[in-house]
Curated annotation (Swiss-Prot):
Region spans: Disordered: 1-121, 238-349, 366-439
Tissues where this protein is expressed: Isoform 3 is expressed in brain.
Protein name (database record): Amyloid-beta A4 precursor protein-binding family A member 1
Domain PID, first and last residues per copy: 460-648
Amino acid sequence: MNHLEGSAEVEVADEAPGGEVNESVEADLEHPEVVEGQQPSPSPPPPAGHEPEDHRGHPAPPPPPPPQEEEEEERGECLARSASTESGFHNHTDTAEGDVLAAARDGYEAERAQDADDESAYAVQYRPEAEEYTEQAEAEHVEAAQRRALPNHLHFHSLEHEEAMNAAYSGYVYTHRLFHRAEDEPYAEPYADYGGLQEHVYEEIGDAPELEARDGLRLYERERDEAAAYRQEALGARLHHYDERSDGESDSPEKEAEFAPYPRMDSYEQEEDIDQIVAEVKQSMSSQSLDKAAEDMPEAEQDLERAPTPGGGHPDSPGLPAPAGQQQRVVGTPGGSEVGQRYSKEKRDAISLAIKDIKEAIEEVKTRTIRSPYTPDEPKEPIWVMRQDISPTRDCDDQRPVDGDSPSPGSSSPLGAESSSIPLHPGDPTEASTNKESRKSLASFPTYVEVPGPCDPEDLIDGIIFAANYLGSTQLLSDKTPSKNVRMMQAQEAVSRIKTAQKLAKSRKKAPEGESQPMTEVDLFISTQRIKVLNADTQEPMMDHPLRTISYIADIGNIVVLMARRRMPRSNSQENVEASHPSQDGKRQYKMICHVFESEDAQLIAQSIGQAFSVAYQEFLRANGINPEDLSQKEYSDLLNTQDMYNDDLIHFSKSENCKDVFIEKQKGEILGVVIVESGWGSILPTVIIANMMHGGPAEKSGKLNIGDQIMSINGTSLVGLPLSTCQSIIKGLKNQSRVKLNIVRCPPVTTVLIRRPDLRYQLGFSVQNGIICSLMRGGIAERGGVRVGHRIIEINGQSVVATPHEKIVHILSNAVGEIHMKTMPAAMYRLLTAQEQPVYI
């Protein structure tokens, strides 16, 4: 909406049907003299030989005698007025809210070329789903043009027809219609009455019988009430829609949270929003004035109905008038004329007041910056809401850090880090009060639970900056969940690739075109939302990764490796293979983007990123109404300090009678005849266990070894902490010896576990898959209780779970509280003892 006075032709874009208010009001701004003084043009004479009919199609009685020519002239003017008005109401389309609708002007074609740029900037495309409705409107426009050829006929516009037209557009909020005047139609006041835009037009031609006029009046009153209710409902819906989208947002933290993920618009989009707000203000204020006029209208009409008729009030009196057009006229009734003039004056006063308010609102919009309801201001203080991931290209301007912002004296951020938090409007008290109210409405949780790390949690919310040198980036293919050792190997490979590329670049006099020079100075921006790499000089974002895509961070000396995950696109053949083999889902390859930096604060950078994950997790808990203290690490550590290590293994190993040196005699070239398995990660002394012995072999014939015995050393060589393959190689090397010395600890094949879990809030600290313990949390209550990775659970609290389904085992463990007694066995030993695997003796 760049100007109020503009075109003569109605610009039909996709505007809400509330737009007719804009058109009518702007028409008044341009032609105030039309509303007050212009008279409608006389109607064209009826065709020769055509007899006028009443509204039911019966021939009308002959015209009155010549002395009543003035009355007929007045009725002719009224008929022309109603005919033009009715044809106008049959020509309407819907346009979208916020477009410009201007009144008529003869020089429109000359101005159209000058305003081409404005039209291209502010034009709104048609709604694709409204095509069916537009076609119906055009068809009705043709029908109305045909009906104008018979000005002496009465054309009924029923509510059922309107509802049928709205069937294809029923999903939209607004239901008002626009007046669209044909280009060749002479100007006649289309909005003589702003209070009844959808009332029906009836005209009495000649002296109709009193009974028919009375029936027409009753029909008019009934349909007028229905149209008024329909209009008020639609108008109320539009006002309610406007209030929901604008007025209620700045006062409600829930609304702020709802619109928080939207990115900030550039200047072009802000201009569009200002124009849209102006349109909404005009519609709202004009509609209020029209609503008031609609409320006052029934009183005036009641006065007209109670006015004395020339026949003395008899119902069959031939002088009973029928309503003419949108404005009631009583022929030959002075009292009725005065009432109509008074009502018309009140109407003009209400419209003038609305125009004045609109002008003031427009001036206020021009002189004051208005925040669009779709781009709420960023808060100066963090508001605890769950945030959605936004595209890096859309919101990089929102979180772009500013140089020179050092951390506050009381901040616990590291010396190498700078805080990037600055208020958008430092002197705006409204924003500060809104933020305070938002914080009061949140759960009364502590601000932060202590999170280990070098930074203050509040600084991580706003973002901190580290200075670094960008060395380069490379891509690696990785599994979905590789181990830490694999991650470190990938990080080292990325560093070696970058250093090799640097050496090649140094060997050349000039780097190839399109390849960045090494050692670019950058600012590494770290927050709970994302990690950005900014050019130190221009502050332009070079890389931007949401925090949730960061899979690994490693510091190797003064080198920092940042690894971000990206899904590798798959070909059709790969998709077909995975569709036929769902088990291959975990084997998908992922692209890992590895960025390599050099910084003196490499360790601080890695620790800060790890701390950002912890603070982001607390944000998630608070947004879901969970007190972070309920799951704090401190409380869990206090629980561990109250528990003693389950020391049955330690006591067993410390007893001298359980530790023995065993000598095995055998023939040279003969194998020892044993099967060994790992004791399992989490045991007191990680070593190998005898899982099976060959029948008739040297180990079995000696009678000194049992299944479950742990081998500490062989011929003075310790096996503690060695990989299983190494231990197997050592035993295989005994083939040429005739005497073997083994140091063993006698242990039962089944291990006893005791877990103390005081409450369901505390996790057990291990995971189970098909009855086998596959992972264990270091330092948790499960490790203290003697749980070992690679063991199969045999028994839980005295109940055997050997043949129990996996889901039931998980259910039992999840609901177990107090002391949990379990018996486990190495899974490989279990398979050998149950003949699920064939032993391979060494």
